[in-house]
């Protein structure tokens, strides 16, 4: 309370000083207001000062009041107040009524709640003095401020609860690592409540912190990551300038030492031992070596190499980037018989050295690698990787064309035998001497059919047939002039009837299957048997071609329509080869430009006296004749259909049988006499007699006319088929006829009616029914004696 009273005294002293410097103007003292502030209400002592109008600017109040009573702020008063209770004081503005309350009679202001400067540090309010009787303001409304003074009630807080930082290892003292920051919500302009000081609680003696800036620095030189990589530092921030009683906050900083290349690689052992078969292929991995480097990442990347000296040309080392190992591989073919042991020096060095630490020594290490070569039974080795041989195509069978040589590289030097791989010489053109490797021919050679022969020779150890090797042999067949030149193509040559002497009618060229090294050279001459041809001559163009030239004016197709011209062709190689080719020259009719129009075919027709119109007429007659022959043949195949009634007396094709007891009037069946004459025509259409037949449309076909048909035999055969038909009803079945059809146009001919009628009936009326019933009238008509 002593501090609080002193603070109020200082504030009001400043206010009174301001009042003393003011000049009072005006004569009416009734317009002066008096503001009375009670500095200490309990003491009962009051300081007052008179001034015209309202004379306050601001009040001050400490935050976080913890008393039980309301906190007194100040008093409002005007000289118009006579103390008789006629004036009423009203307070409006920020917090009026809930935070700040006023005694409307006395003008005393109190804080009803505890205030927090960090929430709101300034309140603006307005004061009024009103006459209770008239309700009018005795003074104009005035504005004043209540400022909240700060107390140290907030501790410093860091922006992060946990910081993460890194610093390179081997850093010097004072190397900056990271800066931490703490803030205090108290008023930095009032006292030391917001003045923060940093200190280190954990992490010494490795790190330190600047008390004002919060920058963490290294405190020890040359800290090694390999010894310790992670550090945890605790930093404290305290207000009140770090004095006793100040509030504080802490944070944690995790610091990692990052790697630098300050360690050279080191082999864990000085000597390595590996073995290799002498037959190991190139690139075979013999073993791995590794140098250790405690650094990390690219600082630990290594490069292996073989130092110049023994074995550097026989072996190689490859760096495995994933495992940082050196892989020893075979670089050249090994030979146990030549060298059995190799000693190599392998170096391992850093690929990214740090110049700052080169003074520590060379960043590489060396180790010795010994490689022992083991003996194996090796296959024969040829003296060459491949052989090329040449031979003339006219050599005799059995001629030697070359030799291959192979040897056993082993110390035992086994005997070698040679053979030809027949898969490469299917025609068995060549063979080889099994002991000395001489290759010779088995068949005649022909360069034109096979200019090259590629065979494979196999060399095999006699004592160990599994040990063998092969080599390709390329045999080129050299050309011999053994083919005569001949025409390059077939020439269709003609000469116009109106040709002039000396006219070129054909240029010929030739071909030769041989291939002389100096190229072809051909010559053309007439054959010796006909050195001088009166019709044509051969002109050698000296460029491997020749021209056929006429020797007279005009040619006649009627006299000679074809000429044969033999040509002698020979080359200039050794031995000289020649051949004779014959040109067939036709005589043709040509236009003025020399284009062929017609040749000897028209000449023959004209000689026979046939014109073009006659030829067309002959062809037309031939076509008509062929058409007539085809029509006649077609008509012959048509067979004449036999008429249903041969004569008017033949009425057999409608004879009706009445001995079928199931028959009625219109359901009786009559035999078709045409069918009886051609029974096979109905074989495929069998109708059941116990059902009503359906209407069947059959294709009408022509049947051959058979004059001699055994109708009786046909009827018996058909009867037998019906008797054996399983679908026909049994003979003793009862047939019921509910409808027997319409009346016949004739009187009833039923057998039932005939039995019941008088035996003496007159059948003469049958003669009136026409020729179809003539036979029936003859059978039943006439006298009884008949």
Curated annotation (Swiss-Prot):
The keyword Ubl conjugation belongs to this UniProt entry's keyword annotation: no
Propeptide: 22-52
GO cellular component, one term: dendrite
Every Cadherin domain range: 54-158, 159-267, 268-382, 383-487, 487-604
Signal peptide region: 1-21
SUPFAM superfamilies per the UniProt record, alphabetical: Cadherin-like
Residue stretches in coiled coil: none
InterPro entries assigned to the protein according to its UniProt record, in alphabetical order: Cadherin, Cadherin-like_dom, Cadherin-like_sf, Cadherin_CS, Cadherin_Y-type_LIR, Catenin-bd_sf
Broad class of where this protein is predominantly found: membrane
Membrane-side (Cytoplasmic) residue stretches: 636-786
Membrane topology field: Single-pass type I membrane protein
Keyword terms: Calcium, Cell adhesion, Cell membrane, Cleavage on pair of basic residues, Glycoprotein, Membrane, Metal-binding, Phosphoprotein, Repeat, Signal, Transmembrane, Transmembrane helix
Modified residues (Phosphoserine): 785
Chain's role: Cadherins are calcium-dependent cell adhesion proteins. They preferentially interact with themselves in a homophilic manner in connecting cells; cadherins may thus contribute to the sorting of heterogeneous cell types.
Record text about domains: Three calcium ions are usually bound at the interface of each cadherin domain and rigidify the connections, imparting a strong curvature to the full-length ectodomain.
Name of this protein: Cadherin-9
Source organism phylogeny: Eukaryota, Metazoa, Chordata, Craniata, Vertebrata
């Amino acid at each position: 309370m002593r501090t609080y009273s002193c603070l109020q005294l200082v504030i009001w002293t400043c206010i009174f000083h301001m009042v003393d410097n003011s000049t009072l103007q005006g004569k009416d003292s009734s317009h002066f207001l008096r503001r009375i502030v009670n500095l200490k209400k309990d003491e009962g002592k009051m300081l007052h000062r008179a001034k015209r109008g309202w004379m306050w600017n601001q009040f001050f109040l400490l935050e976080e009041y913890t008393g039980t009573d309301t906190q007194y702020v100040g008093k409002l008063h005007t000289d118009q107040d006579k103390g008789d209770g006629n004036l009423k004081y009203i307070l409006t503005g920020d917090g009026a009524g809930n935070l700040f309350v006023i005694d409307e009679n006395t003008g005393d202001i109190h804080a009803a709640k505890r205030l927090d400067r960090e929430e709101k540090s300034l309140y603006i309010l307005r004061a009024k003095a009103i006459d209770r009787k008239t309700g009018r303001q005795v003074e104009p409304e005035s504005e004043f401020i209540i400022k909240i003074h700060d107390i140290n009630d907030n501790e410093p807080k860091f922006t992060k609860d946990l910081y993460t930082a890194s610093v390179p290892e081997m850093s010097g003292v004072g190397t900056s690592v990271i800066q931490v920051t703490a803030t205090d919500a108290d008023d930095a302009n009032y006292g030391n409540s917001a003045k923060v000081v940093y200190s280190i609680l954990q992490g010494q003696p490795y790190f330190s912190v600047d008390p004002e800036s919060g920058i963490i620095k290294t405190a020890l030189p040359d800290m090694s990551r390999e010894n310790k990589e992670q550090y945890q530092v605790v930093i404290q921030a305290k207000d009140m300038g770090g004095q006793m009683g100040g509030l504080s906050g802490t944070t944690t900083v995790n610091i990692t030492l990052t790697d630098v290349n300050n360690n050279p690689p080191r082999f864990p052992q000085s000597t390595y031992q590996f073995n290799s078969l002498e037959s190991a292929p190139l690139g075979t991995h013999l073993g791995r070596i590794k140098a250790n480097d405690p650094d990390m990442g690219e600082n630990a990347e290594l490069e292996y190499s073989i130092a110049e000296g023994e074995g550097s040309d026989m072996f190689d080392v490859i760096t495995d980037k994933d495992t940082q190992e050196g892989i020893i591989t075979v670089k050249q073919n090994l030979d146990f018989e030549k060298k059995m042991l190799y000693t190599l020096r392998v170096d391992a060095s850093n690929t990214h050295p740090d110049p700052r630490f080169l003074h520590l020594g060379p960043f590489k290490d060396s180790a010795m690698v010994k490689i022992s070569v083991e003996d194996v039974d090796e296959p024969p080795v040829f003296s060459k990787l491949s052989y090329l041989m040449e031979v003339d195509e006219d050599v005799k069978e059995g001629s030697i064309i070359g030799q291959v040589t192979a040897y056993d590289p082993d110390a035992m030097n086994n005997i070698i035998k040679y053979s030809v791989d027949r898969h490469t010489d299917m025609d068995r053109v060549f063979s080889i001497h099994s002991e000395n490797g001489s290759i010779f021919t088995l068949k005649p050679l022909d360069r034109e059919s096979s200019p090259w022969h590629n065979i494979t020779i196999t060399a095999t150890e006699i004592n160990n047939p599994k040990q063998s090797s092969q080599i390709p042999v390329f045999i080129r067949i050299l050309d011999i002039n053994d083919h005569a030149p001949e025409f390059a193509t077939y020439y269709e040559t003609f000469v116009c009837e109106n040709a002039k002497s000396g006219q070129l009618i054909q240029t010929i060229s030739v071909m030769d299957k041989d291939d002389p090294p100096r190229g072809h050279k051909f010559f053309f001459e007439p054959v010796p048997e006909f050195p001088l041809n009166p019709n044509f001559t051969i002109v050698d163009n000296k460029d491997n071609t020749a021209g056929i030239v006429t020797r007279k004016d005009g040619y006649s197709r009627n006299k000679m329509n074809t000429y044969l011209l033999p040509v002698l062709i020979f080359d200039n190689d050794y031995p000289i080869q020649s051949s004779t080719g014959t040109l067939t020259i036709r005589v043709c009719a040509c236009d003025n430009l020399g284009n062929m129009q017609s040749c000897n075919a028209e000449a023959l027709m004209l000689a026979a006296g046939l014109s073009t119109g006659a030829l067309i007429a002959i062809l037309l007659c031939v076509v008509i004749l062929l058409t007539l022959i085809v029509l006649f043949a077609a008509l012959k195949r048509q067979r004449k259909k036999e008429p249903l009634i041969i004569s008017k007396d033949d009425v057999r094709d409608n004879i009706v049988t009445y001995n079928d007891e199931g028959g009625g009037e219109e359901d009786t069946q009559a035999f078709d006499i045409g069918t009886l004459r051609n029974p096979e025509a109905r074989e495929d259409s069998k109708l059941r007699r116990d059902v009503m037949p359906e209407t069947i449309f059959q294709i009408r076909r022509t049947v051959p006319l058979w004059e001699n048909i055994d109708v009786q035999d046909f009827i018996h055969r058909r009867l037998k088929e019906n008797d054996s038909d399983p679908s026909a009803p049994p003979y003793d079945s009862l047939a019921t006829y509910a409808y027997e059809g319409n009346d016949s146009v004739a009187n009833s001919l039923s057998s039932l009616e005939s039995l019941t009628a008088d035996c003496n009936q007159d059948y003469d009326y049958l003669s009136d029914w026409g020729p179809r019933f003539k036979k029936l009238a003859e059978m039943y008509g006439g006298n009884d004696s008949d």
